[in-house]
Amino acid sequence: MDRVYLIGNGYVCNFITAKFSSEYDFVGICRSKKDNCAHNYSVDVSNDNGILKEIIEKDGYVVYLAPPQNNGLKDQILVKFLKSIYKKKIVKIIYISTSGVYGDRKDALVNENEKIMPRTERAQRRADAEYQIKNSGIKYTILRVPGIYGKGRLPLKRVNDRLPLIKKEICKHTNLINAKDLSNIIIQTLTNNNTANIIMNVSDGTPIKTTEYYLHIYDQLNMKYPEFIDYAQANKTYDSKRKSFINESMILDVSLMNEIFPDIIEYKDIKEGIKDSLG
C-alpha cells in the first residue's frame, strides 16, 4: 500500500481519507489533533524542528495543502518544509495552489499557458510556492484550484446575515469545485503519468456568476433574497478579503483536466453540489 503524506491535513483531507483509506496508507500532519489518517501527527510545519525527517521516513507521495504565512511575498513555510525533508524519499508532490495567481482577467478564458499576474500578496505567496515546487527537484503536479465548497464549507453565515449581493446583470463570474471532486482529482493525480511535472487548472467546468451561486443557496434554504447592490456599494460594504474576490474574475479553462481525467467531475451542476453539501 503506497504511503501518502498529507501536509496541512485539513478540510479537503477529510474527504480524501473518507474515500481512499482502504487504498493508501495516509499520514496526516497539521497543527491540530486529528484521527482521520492511519498515522496522525500534530506538528506545526512552519517550525523547522527536524521532526519532519523523522515522520517522512518512508518513501511516499506528498499532498501539500498547508497555506503560506499571512504576510510577505515568499512562502516561508514551504521553504522550511523543503529544507526539512529528505527529497529523495518523495515520489511525487501534489501542490494545491490557487487560481488567484492569474489575477483579474475580466471574465476571459484562462488556460495554464497564460502568464500569471497575482495582484494580492496572498496570491503572490502562492506564485512563489509554485516556483519553489517547480525548482525543488521533486516530481510534481501543481493544481490551480478555485473556490472550494462542500459540506460545512458553504457561505451560510453570509447568507444568514443577508449580506447584500451584487446585481446579477453586472456580476462577474467565479469558478468553483466541490470538495469531493477535488479530493478525487488529487488522488487520481498521484499515480497518473500524464500529470508529471505539469500545472493543471481544476474546477467543476461550469463557471457561474457569484450572485447566482448565492441565490442557489437561498433557493435550497427557501429563504428570501437579500438586497442587491452595485460594485461601488459592494466595495464600501464588503471586507477586504471579500473585495479582493469580487474584483477579480476569470473563466478557468479545464480542457487539460478533462483530457487527462474525462468524466471525473461528479458535481458539474452547482445546484446538486449545494444540495449534497446541505445534506
Walk through the language-model features, giving the residues of each:
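N-terminal Rossmann-fold NAD(P) dinucleotide-binding loop
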Residues: 13-14
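NAD(P)-cofactor binding segment of oxidoreductase domains
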Residues: 57-95, 128
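Conserved Rossmann-fold NAD(P)-dependent oxidoreductase catalytic core, especially the SDR/UDP-sugar
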Residues: 82-119
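Catalytic helix-loop patch of NAD(P)-dependent Rossmann-fold dehydrogenases
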Residues: 106-142
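Substrate-positioning beta->alpha
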Residues: 154-158, 167-191, 198
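Mid/C-terminal beta-alpha module of Rossmann-like enzyme folds, strongest
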Residues: 192-241
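C-terminal amphipathic/interface module of NAD(P)-dependent oxidoreductases
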Residues: 224, 244-279
